[in-house]
């Protein structure tokens, strides 16, 4: 980590996509080791497992950003780094499908850290929204958005509420309400989400928006 930390600041290497990929790969190897140990029934540090994923995702976002920056040969022809994205994509998909951040997020919540729990849950549900996934729709299609995905959004909003990160709580819960296709499949979560939104607006003194949030539940579930 010391060596790669230096490379991330070195003038000759800090703007190279591969430098940031390698930085993220360190966290990935920690994830991979922990994942193998878990499969073998060994105890693992779930918090460290989640932290390594968060770290590598951040590094790989930067790596992909740099991979999109062209370099030019002597003839002035633009060249792009196509290797780095191909290295990142399967690993990000693996993170999502293993729900590592969900496990680590619940651990954080149980340790009375709802703010960190929110960060981990929202990082998980945002994986399909990463630019690299959007630019490779065939890979993004492999990331399921079933009821579990929207349940994660609900919990992320709830954790943000408990962490008093109210703007993020509203945005996340509204996102769940807006994106899900089948309200009946998430009846309980939709009702609770609007109750959290209602409570936030009441605490902020905005009765108009508070009433609107409850009306949404009534309109969906008039019975």
Predicted regions and their residues:
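Generic helix N-cap/helix-start motif at coil->alpha-helix transitions
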Residues: 96-101, 145-155, 185-195, 220-223
